[in-house]
Regions:
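Beta/coil-rich, acidic/histidine-enriched accessory regions frequently appended to metallopeptidases
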Residues: 223-388
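Non-transmembrane alpha-helical segments in soluble domains
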Residues: 50, 57-61, 157, 201-205, ...
Length: 388
């Protein structure tokens, strides 16, 4: 079995290897056997690593049939290196054909020991990194670039969380980084926002066919479509009338009430809202792949409310508004859809009053979403609120 050169992080005193295989793929696991080394992993622990990797590769390549990654030239298996002291839980290193002296393909490094301390944590990390190598299989070994780069961590984070099925334990902090910045386009992946954008692949998955919806998205990417159009076409397998704009707007409806996410247990923060008791606002920009959430709270003197929305620049055809209504008893929110047919329309809500019954709505969130999938088109809107 030929193995290409190890990454520089894999500096073992005494190297051990294990091979894990199924009918589609084979992985060689590398680890430190020297018990005096800080990176030592016992044979008992490596037995567990074998079981974890076998389960994950069966999950991806047998159960769901994802394409296998590119093997490095001359290799007969894929490589995972367990090494200590990394700056993250793990990483996948891509080798392109132009890399100096290195055959194309990828290798994975997992930070173990000591930073990963639980069984689910190590499983999630391995599943996340293997999914990165799967991404390369659909992108001619280039990964996601340009405007689509956000999907790199968003989809891998979702895939890892989906595998361990513990979104809240490991996804909450990531999700909340995105939920405080929904007005910022996907193209801004600073401050690790893209990890929290796993919520968009999660919404697609829980609505349009599970992990297969992500696999179909990658297949369309491989056919030359950008990510957002690929997500639309994937959704159309389940609903042939699905459009990217409505998918994104319903995603933002979930962000207004994250209890709608599977396994969130209502513990994600709601998307950051602008002033809850705004009377008027003007020229609010809504960029492609972003949304603006406005909150409205009833007072003891209100019984209804009307909100007039005006599109002040850009095209109203790029806008969808969702009014999310939260009942007084804390039950499930409901929403009303507004797809503008002109530059101005008015929303009227009765039962906008304080109280603790299901028949009143003491709190509303108006969500303005941008339906454009080109990463560039924007519009601006203003609103005027009148209490009744």
């Amino acid at each position: 079995m030929k193995i290409s050169s190890a990454p520089p992080e894999a500096n073992y005193t005494t190297e051990g290897t294990r091979t894990v295989s199924n009918a589609k793929i084979s992985y060689t696991l590398h680890y430190e056997k020297d018990s005096a080394s800080s990176g030592y992993i016992s044979e008992t622990l490596m037995n567990s690593m074998e079981v974890y990797v076998k389960s994950i590769i069966d999950h991806y390549f047998i159960t769901y049939g994802f394409n296998t990654p590119m093997l490095r030239t001359g290799d007969t298996s894929y490589q995972i290196y367990f090494v200590p002291g990394l700056n993250s839980n793990g990483f996948t290193r891509r080798y392109s054909k132009s890399s100096s002296g290195e055959p194309a393909g990828s290798s994975i490094c997992i930070n173990y020991p000591p930073s990963i301390n639980t069984t689910d944590d190590i499983k999630k990390t391995i599943a996340h990194e293997i999914f990165h190598s799967i991404q390369y299989a659909y992108t001619s070994q280039m990964g996601f670039t340009g405007n689509d780069k956000w999907f790199t961590e968003a989809s891998a984070t979702y895939a890892g969380l989906n595998y361990v099925n513990k979104y809240l334990s490991y996804g909450k902090s990531h999700a909340n980084k995105y939920l405080v910045s929904v007005e910022t386009p996907f193209t801004d992946i600073s401050n690790n926002r893209s990890y929290g954008m796993f919520l968009f692949p999660q919404y697609l998955s829980q609505t349009y066919g599970g992990l297969n919806s992500i696999k179909r998205t990658l297949e369309y990417v491989s056919s030359g479509y950008p990510v957002l159009k690929s997500m639309e076409k994937s959704a159309q397998y389940s609903d042939n009338s699905a459009t990217y704009g409505e998918i994104f707007a319903m995603f933002q409806r979930c962000n207004a009430d994250p209890r709608r996410y599977v396994n969130s247990n209502g513990q994600y923060n709601e998307a950051t809202r602008r002033l809850d008791n705004v009377g008027t606002a003007s020229n609010i920009p809504v960029l492609s792949t972003s949304a603006v959430h406005y909150g409205l709270k009833a007072s003891s003197t209100t019984s209804a409310v009307s909100v007039t929305v005006n599109i002040t620049s850009g095209s109203y055809t790029n806008a969808i508004f969702k009014l999310v209504k939260f009942p007084g008893d804390g039950g499930s929110s409901v929403y009303v859809n507004y797809k503008p047919t002109s530059t101005s329309f008015t929303i009227y809500v009765s039962s906008f009053k304080t109280g603790t019954t299901s028949s009143v709505y003491p709190r509303l969130t108006l969500v303005a979403s941008n339906t454009s999938d080109d990463y560039t088109t924007s519009y601006k809107f203003g609103l005027t609120r009148t209490n009744k």
